């Protein structure tokens, strides 16, 4: 079984990280974009099968999504589950875990944007419930711009049970809500932590909330305005990065 991915950044990411997954690359005839030309040159040098197509054919293959003149047919990444998570928890000796839990993010664009932010923030793993999450499809991969191949993406059968497991391994659970007694910027985030983000329509579910150690919110100047979940995720993640990297009066990104 194979899947299609499209876009310069997305295909380039697979070329860089796992070219053995690529079965064939479809490219637009007579490309003009210099980035695309450079990528095609690299692909040819790697002896990967290439087929030139009209833009109309590429539009059909991508269902009229923005393919930027290149589509790759690839072997999907292996699915990760609770076994992968448990192995990570048992062998996390030399790192301070930063995990992202997405509860009910069903919009592919939001999921892709969350994955991209997670990659930029150095998240070690994304955890989603098996029955309440968008699949990592071509749209998610395009929005994630290659990040979906770098951040481990774990689907779990029971999210509440998974949060209990994280606590057993001393992972502190912080949930994002619209209103609470604690604001994000006054919350300690430098310890092993899992940040829990919910859907825009209903937030994190009741059982998920009950398994959080702390519920916090992002203060906004307009109380009637709520943030897009991917924007809120980015704010949560980079407040964590800020706290972890801030040393001796300056931010140390070394």
UniProtKB/Swiss-Prot annotation:
EC number: 2.1.1.185
GO annotation, cellular component aspect: cytosol
Keywords attached to this entry: Cytoplasm, Methyltransferase, rRNA processing, S-adenosyl-L-methionine, Transferase
Main localization category: cytoplasm
Listed CDD domains: SpoU-like_RlmB
Entry binding sites for S-adenosyl-L-methionine: 198, 218, 227
Entry-linked Pfam families: SpoU_methylase, SpoU_sub_bind
Location relative to the cell: Cytoplasm
GO molecular function: RNA binding; rRNA (guanosine-2'-O-)-methyltransferase activity
Reaction catalyzed: guanosine(2251) in 23S rRNA + S-adenosyl-L-methionine = 2'-O-methylguanosine(2251) in 23S rRNA + S-adenosyl-L-homocysteine + H(+)
Taxonomy, superkingdom: Bacteria
TM spans (from-to): none
InterPro entries xrefs: 23S_rRNA_MeTrfase_RlmB, Alpha/beta_knot_MTases, Ribosomal_eL30-like_sf, rRNA_MeTrfase_TrmH, SpoU_MeTrfase, SpoU_subst-bd, tRNA_m1G_MTases_N
Primary role: Specifically methylates the ribose of guanosine 2251 in 23S rRNA.
Cited NCBIfam families: rRNA_methyl_3 (TIGR00186)
HAMAP family: 23SrRNA_methyltr_B
Similarity comment text for this entry: Belongs to the class IV-like SAM-binding methyltransferase superfamily. RNA methyltransferase TrmH family. RlmB subfamily.
PANTHER family noted in UniProt: 23S RRNA (GUANOSINE-2'-O-)-METHYLTRANSFERASE RLMB (PTHR46429:SF1)
Assembly and binders: Homodimer.
Protein name: 23S rRNA (guanosine-2'-O-)-methyltransferase RlmB
Native source organism of the sequence: Blochmanniella floridana
UniProt gene name: rlmB
């Amino acid at each position: 079984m194979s899947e299609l991915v499209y876009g310069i950044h997305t295909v380039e990411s697979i070329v860089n990280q796992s070219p053995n997954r690529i079965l064939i690359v479809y490219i637009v005839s007579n490309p003009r974009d210099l980035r695309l030309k450079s990528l095609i040159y690299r692909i040819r040098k790697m002896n990967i099968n290439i087929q030139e197509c009209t833009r109309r054919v590429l539009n059909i293959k991508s269902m009229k999504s923005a393919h930027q003149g290149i589509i790759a047919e690839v072997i999907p990444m292996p699915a990760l589950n609770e076994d992968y998570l448990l192995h990570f928890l048992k062998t996390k000796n030399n790192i301070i875990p930063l995990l992202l839990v997405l509860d009910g993010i069903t919009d592919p664009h939001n999921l892709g944007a969350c994955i991209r932010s997670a990659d930029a923030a150095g998240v070690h793993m994304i955890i989603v419930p098996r029955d309440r999450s968008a699949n990592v499809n071509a749209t998610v991969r395009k929005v994630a711009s290659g990040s979906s191949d770098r951040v481990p993406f774990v689907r779990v059968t029971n999210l509440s049970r998974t949060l209990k497991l994280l606590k057993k391994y001393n992972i502190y659970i912080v949930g994002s809500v619209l209103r609470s007694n604690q604001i994000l910027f006054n919350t300690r985030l430098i310890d092993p932590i899992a940040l829990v983000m919910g859907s825009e329509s209903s937030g994190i579910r009741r059982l998920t909330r009950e398994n959080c150690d702390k519920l916090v919110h992002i203060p906004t100047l307009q109380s009637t305005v709520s943030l897009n979940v991917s924007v809120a995720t980015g704010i949560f993640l980079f407040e964590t990065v800020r706290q972890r990297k801030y040393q001796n009066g300056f931010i140390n990104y070394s």
